[in-house]
Amino acid sequence: FMEIYKKQTLSETFSVYFEKRMARILLLGIISGFPWVLIGSSLSLWLKEDGLSRSTIGWAGLIFAVYAFNYLWAPIIDRIRIPWLTNKIGHRRGWIVTMQIVILISLVCWSFINPTANLALVISIGLIIAIASATQDITVDALRIEQVGEDEGKSMQAGAAMAVVGWWTGYKLGGVIALNAAEFFQQAGFENYWQITFLVLGVVVIACNIGLMFVHEPQPTERQKSQIRTDQMIEEKLGASNVATKSVAWISGTVAGPIISFFKKNGFKIALGILGFVFLFKIGEAFLGRMSIIFYKEIGFSKSDIALYSKGLGWITTVVFTLLGGLFAIRSGVIKAMFVSGILMASTNLLFSVLAWSGKSEWLFAVAVIFDDMAAAFATVAFVAFISMLVDRTYTATQYALLASIGTAGRTTLAASSGAMVDWLNGDWGIFFVITAIMVIPSLICLWFIKDKLSLQ
């Protein structure tokens, strides 16, 4: 279908972004991205300003590892219904609202705690937010993919772009709200300014849930029928039909079905190649992202500077280049988009080395942030489109969660050592950013070997 897209004018290709369902996908992205503000930059800066070390903050980021394992409970989320809520607002939305309530309660708990005296409790609540966020992502991604028909490749890539725009909107604008609120309350003389900020962020969570009620949820009949057929097939192979065999069939169909389907569709070697690429692709970007706000603070930028350049300016750049990245993926193909974005990610990380070696410079900070966000936007939209096109609709939630989790595993578990790496380099931020640039190369080698054999819809 690539030839058809290339014959279209740019305005015809771009028109897909103005469909109603793209606005719904945008909101789902915002809901998914916002919790990262809470356990990312907000938590990091809260701990930093309470006097905790870079290494401690880096290791605290291990709570993000939860995102790497949400595929383990994705099959259950795909099947189990939330009492009352599922009947009222649908299966997917019922799960999202439940997890949003958990996040809201966690924010209220944070607002009563001093991190220096209760570090373990602060991190534990952060972990609860991460688990709730990772769980809602399973249904958010499934609901997003189900907004688009299975044979609509163009709309799937545009939907991926809108989801990424939404995610970064939730993350960047959420960051603008968090940083400016914290600075406002700090300057107003409140000692517990971060705790008050978390209550403000709770209002954003409530607003997102109101918006969610306008997102259409398709009837899950086909998915359920297909899952029942898989259960029956396993039950027949087990022989006698009783409670035990029905339970084994349900568990096997729930857990093994999605994995068998993935390997069957792609073949064993290609499936392993896909998993290797997904694991490695964004490791360098994660190392940079985990420590970036600490780096900005250490070279002399204030919270309002970071809010303006990294969050505000970064958000505008991300939105523009995500939409352009979506167009590039539609017109040039998702594989080419992956290669281009990988090279861009590595190149832009080097700009932070220049900033580290030259010292505090607002214009250089702005340039580094713009180009880094441009590369991250291209990379993320290509990556989301890539794994969205690999999933089987029978197991949408589970397969997407599995692929996204493997990508997150590389980024979260390994990137937790980012603070320790900076300490090991004696605070040489320049060398640290050079190392993050080199980290993308293994994933591109993986992609090169499997690119001609991929089964993309």
Regions found by a protein language model. Give the residues of each.
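Transmembrane alpha-helices of Major Facilitator/SLC transporters
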Residues: 66-73, 308-330, 341, 348
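Helix-to-loop junctions at the C-terminal end of transmembrane segments
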Residues: 70-88, 320-337, 422-423
